């Protein structure tokens, strides 16, 4: 166990394929809308989140272009943007990354997504077997890292060949923007230990997270590297535990058994991801055993690929669960909640004070020092409270 000596680094999420209030239902859904994404990013920027994750995939907006747009509408927010090796050359991605880091004044974080759906990868023109994708990614980032760190690269590899590759303009961050990565297979863990700066795990029970952290630390040490750790979780936080569990039930209240079965069939047929298999194993497609660890709820994974668990509870309860993960070595949380605009406020307003994170940035004072309470926003303003004598 590790001593907890500083607050968590907390990022939010841009739902770039769309959003909604119910899983598995079109009721009160929100389409992929750039204006809505800007609202979420601006809220996260003000509410105290350090950054946002922008996902990648066939159903999502292109992550680099969306990040460039959001950077123009925010001041301090960082952008965790995906690179999928094989969809373009490492030299091209190096130019994208350096330029985005420059135009955002050093606000780029890079998320390495090797891919877990053979069907989607085939659509991108990638046909490598599972483990070979990590060998390919290793060569890809040899070239990428050399370019963004030194401006030049050469490699005569099995998968990647680069002859006198050049990058004319460096990124703002030195030696380069940080590399994040998540994967649960042996090949993924070996790759992470040698390449990445921060290893990300999906929200599994603490004992399973501890096992993965130990494996990554061992792989990193064998290669003379140091890796830090983060966790990807959804959040359902309310003032009381009872309200939070009611909100979790509401989120899947329009989800039919037929929709669950169809989603699970797609996961089984299209994915060779070990991490996805671990997510499915937590709930086994059943909605009657979704609390897989204290306050860790697997309901989202019934129909959502990728991160499928949420911490559910009051601020105090969730803070206790987060401290358990921190004690294992987790220092970063990539969070989300449905719908993402409203839940960004709930997590910031309810949970952040409990875990020692500051409130909104740039908050304007609401009085000359007298205590006031919200009075409904009428013409008379908020209600003054006489100080005790």
UniProtKB/Swiss-Prot annotation:
EC number per UniProt: 1.14.14.5
Keywords, ordered alphabetically: Flavoprotein, FMN, Monooxygenase, Oxidoreductase, Plasmid
Enzyme class: oxidoreductase
Gene Ontology MF terms: alkanesulfonate monooxygenase activity
Superkingdom of the source species: Bacteria
InterPro entries to which the protein is assigned, alphabetical: Alkanesulphonate_mOase_FMN-dep, Luciferase-like_dom, Luciferase-like_sf, SsuD_RutA_monooxygenase
Any one GO biological process: alkanesulfonate catabolic process
UniProt catalytic activity: an alkanesulfonate + FMNH2 + O2 = an aldehyde + FMN + sulfite + H2O + 2 H(+)
Protein purpose: Catalyzes the desulfonation of aliphatic sulfonates.
Family: Belongs to the SsuD family.
PANTHER family: ALKANESULFONATE MONOOXYGENASE, ALKANESULFONATE MONOOXYGENASE-RELATED
Name of the protein described by the UniProt record: Alkanesulfonate monooxygenase
Gene for this chain: ssuD
């Amino acid at each position: 166990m590790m001593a907890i000596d500083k607050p968590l680094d907390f990022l939010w999420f841009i739902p770039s394929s769309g959003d909604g209030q119910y899983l598995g239902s079109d009721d009160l859904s929100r389409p992929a809308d750039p204006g809505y994404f800007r609202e979420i990013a601006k809220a996260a920027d003000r509410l105290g989140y350090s950054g946002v994750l922008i996902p990648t995939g066939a159903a999502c907006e292109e992550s680099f272009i969306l990040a460039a747009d959001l950077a123009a509408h925010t001041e301090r927010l960082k952008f965790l943007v995906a690179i999928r090796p094989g969809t373009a050359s490492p030299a091209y991605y190096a130019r994208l990354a350096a330029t985005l880091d420059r135009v955002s004044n050093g606000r780029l974080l890079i998320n390495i997504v090797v891919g877990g759906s053979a069907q989607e990868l085939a659509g991108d023109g990638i046909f490598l077997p599972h483990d070979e994708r990590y060998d390919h990614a290793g060569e890809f980032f040899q070239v990428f890292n050399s370019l963004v760190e030194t401006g030049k690269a050469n490699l005569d590899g099995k998968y990647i060949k680069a002859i006198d590759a050049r990058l004319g303009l460096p990124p703002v961050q030195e030696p380069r923007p940080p590399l994040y990565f998540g994967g649960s297979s042996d090949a993924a863990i070996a790759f992470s230990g040698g390449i990445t700066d921060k290893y990300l795990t999906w929200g599994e029970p603490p004992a399973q997270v501890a096992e993965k952290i130990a494996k990554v630390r061992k792989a990193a040490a064998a290669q003379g590297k140091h890796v830090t750790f983060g966790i990807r979780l959804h959040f359902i936080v309310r003032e009381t535990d009872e309200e939070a569990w009611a909100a979790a039930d509401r989120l899947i209240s329009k989800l039919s058994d037929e929709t669950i079965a169809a989603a699970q069939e797609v996961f089984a047929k299209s994915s060779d991801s070990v991490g996805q298999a671990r997510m499915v194993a937590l709930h086994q497609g059943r909605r009657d055993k979704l609390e897989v660890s204290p306050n860790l709820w697997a309901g989202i994974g019934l129909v959502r690929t990728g991160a499928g668990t949420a911490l559910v509870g009051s601020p105090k309860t969730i803070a206790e669960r987060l401290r358990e993960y921190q004690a294992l070595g987790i220092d970063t949380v990539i969070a989300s909640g449905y719908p993402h605009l409203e839940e960004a406020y709930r997590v910031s307003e309810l949970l952040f004070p409990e875990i020692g994170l500051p409130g909104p940035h740039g908050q304007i004072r609401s009085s000359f020092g007298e205590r006031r309470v919200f009075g409904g926003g009428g013409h008379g303003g908020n209600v003054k409270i006489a100080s005790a004598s």
